[in-house]
Amino acid sequence: MSLLVKNIGTLVGIDESGRLRVEGKAMAEIGMLENAWLLTDGDRIKDYGTMERLPHIENCEVLDAKGGWLFPSFCDSHTHIVYAGSREQEFLDKINGLTYEEIAKRGGGILNSADRLHDTSEDELYRQAMERVDEIISMGTGLVEIKSGYGLTLEDELKILRVIRRIKETSP
């Protein structure tokens, strides 16, 4: 199914140079197109341009961006995806006003996470992390930076880094 997004205030990520990789200072160059439209076909971008040059397109769903910005995907530059178990209860506790110290007294916090990570195999950490990666990809994340930090020992930090390498090797 085709989707036409029209009236885009700023279409971000336009690069017609054909570069496959951007590094160093070139990362500061972000191509943008003002007052734009974008046509997709399935999960592929088919065409784009300025509203002044929007051709007549039939048989597609139309979405009016109403002047909003459109990014090719979400870039999450700070994640700790490699950890064992779940920290959802800690998140709820924080929302409900508990302090970090109170959460730690209840068995949560970084020390609890470090203990669980230490006791979990690399294969299991990879499996859990890939579930998280697949979930964020399904929600529109196209680029993610994965940080270590839950290991607290050299051995466990290296374990996290090996899992991160596996994720990098097996993810889109």
Predicted regions and their residues:
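Metal-associated gating/positioning segment near the N- to mid-region
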Residues: 60, 65-127
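Active-site loop-helix segments enriched in His/Asp/Glu that coordinate
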Residues: 86-94, 116-172
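Divalent metal-coordination and catalytic microenvironments
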Residues: 8, 38, 43, 67, ...
